[in-house]
Amino acid sequence: MPDVRRAAAPRARSADPIAEEAAELLGSGAVPAMNAAVSPSVAAGREMMDRAMRIVPARSELRVTNEAGFVLHAHPYRETSLVLDVFTRDHGRVAMVAKGAKRPHSALRAVLQHFHPIALSWTGRGEVKTLTKAEYVGGMLPLSGDALLSGFYLNELLLRFCPREDAHPTLFRHYMATLTRLSHGEPASFVLRSFERVLLQETGFAVAFDQCLRSGERVQPGLDYVYQPERGVRRTHASDPSSWPVVSGQTLLDMAQDDYSRAQTVSQSRALMRFLLHYYLQGAPLKTRQILIDLQYL
């Protein structure tokens, strides 16, 4: 599993005290680091604060305009502002302060909503940027009911697996497509399996599902396989741990093609993705996932 943490750098106090406080708030509610040796929440908070307060002297202030993005999470900040965690097309996950966004007559209130496609502009050179403009782009149907809960599950996955400021344009496009599919009423279990697979592959946690990694041979539909964490697909062995789900080659081929028309593919892909997500998160629970499991959508 790749280490998504960045190398440590000398710390310096942030030039913006608001950004500094926002980083502290964001860190206190940050998602646990997957490989933290100490308490996950403590480790995440420390790392977020370290990076938020870091200033790189040789780097000019970053200004980004009209970047496509979505709000993944928002923390209330002070009386009138928000700290946002957004997912953008060309910059990946970005933390930023939306000053005055909670004011009654702020134009940002209606724009900074979950699952709204928006054009974002920001400035800053630390971990926490300052939002300067946000415009609703439109073009997508709103989520409601079960689809809305599934959307929050997608957001939680992105928060867990995507490091900050690491662009994943393919994953961004797939996120948009997944929201569209959910808004049109496609079965959540099918749509979410597809997103989970792309997420693990795009973030480097998983490889191809239709090819044996060691031999390079294409998966055969009539044979049984396991997905060995850190290595990939291979034929089953008698010595395989009982916790590793056995899946048919047909299931793996179907997953690679986003085909969930077979009942066996639906059940086996569910077991496989539960196993992989549990492994790569080191057992850390996903809040929305448990709700969906209880509702039998996962």
Curated annotation (Swiss-Prot):
GO terms classed as biological process: DNA recombination; double-strand break repair
Record carries keyword DNA repair: yes
UniProt-listed Pfam families: RecO_C, RecO_N
Domain of life the protein comes from: Bacteria
Gene3D superfamilies attached to this UniProt entry: Nucleic acid-binding proteins, Recombination protein O, C-terminal domain
UniProt xrefs under InterPro entries: ARFGAP/RecO, DNA_rep/recomb_RecO_N, NA-bd_OB-fold, RecO, RecO_C
Keywords: DNA damage, DNA recombination, DNA repair
Gene Ontology annotations for the cellular component aspect, listed alphabetically: bacterial nucleoid
Family: Belongs to the RecO family.
Function: Involved in DNA repair and RecF pathway recombination.
Protein name: DNA repair protein RecO
Provenance organism: Cupriavidus metallidurans (strain ATCC 43123 / DSM 2839 / NBRC 102507 / CH34)
